[in-house]
Amino acid sequence: MKKLLLLFITTTFLFWGCESTTEPQPIRELNKAVIVVNEGGFQAGNSSITTYSIEDKTAQSDVYYTVNDLKSLGDTGNDLVIVDEKGFIAVTGSNKIEVVTINDFKSIGEIDFTDFGGPRNIVISENMGYATTSNSALVKFDINSLSIIDTLNLGFKPEGITSADGKLFIAISGWGSGNSITVVDETAFKIVKNILVKENPINICSIGNIVYSISTGTYSYFGGDGMGMLTKIDAKSMNIIDTLQIEENPGRFAFNDGEELFVINGNGIVHISGKDMSIVNPTLISAATVNNISYSIYSVGYDKDAEMLYLGNPKDFSQNGEIAIFDLSGNEQERFDVGINPGTIVFKK
């Protein structure tokens, strides 16, 4: 739990320096690549993009900054969704969704969220985008015109969002006090159900018509037991199918089409079978193996073609981090450098 306390204190209160910006190098267009959104420091305005070529195993830093006339991406890049040739980046502290051409990261526009609070997480469905915000709103926007279509008030502090069976499933974290998944009909844009889950649901995904949500639970240093939970939901009926307890405050996770989940907790990476709702390996990869400074893993991505895990190492949360690549047996393959606090890992194939 000391590891998680360090993570909480550091990411909440520390002000970071800027990622180094050496002489910009020419940016290659992306083919098979890993894209890392580095959050940067809290209120430091130094969020950045790192790309990594899977084919030649080389990384390029400060990509957005370099191709956009040395313009900063903004404060706290929090999510990235790719649709066709566009990338939609939630930049929470700058109250915007930045829109880029995904092959070169040139800016083609932005969606202003000043009136709704910083965008947190994004999902795209049927040419419409949906974003949760720090002011407890759900914002619907057109991905072609980049105009806001509608807004809906949600419960306190919504976080993760996914789409399944014509519905949006939204984790209502309440900064730790929330305990529900709100379901919104996409066509009517109305709340149709609230599903009660364990405290502090933050991360959510869908595989077909099955929705998986991770509740982080309460932290022991706040009087909690540190026990989180995976909740499996049928998207059609909107009913809970099964639950699975996970120790050490689980958080972000990645998954594959076989319903295997790779969940970050205080000890490292937990390997879970979603089909069986069972823990395959409680510590597939230890946090200390990835990060020997603060013993914390910050993000996780899964390359389904190579069957590799990409793990974000924030080091001490104030210096540039790295991505560590592991196979599914827990063996390290390689690492590459990224910016400060690598929080989102996306694959472009």
PLM features: residue spans?
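Predominantly soluble domains enriched in secretory-pathway, periplasmic, or organellar proteins
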Residues: 4, 19-349
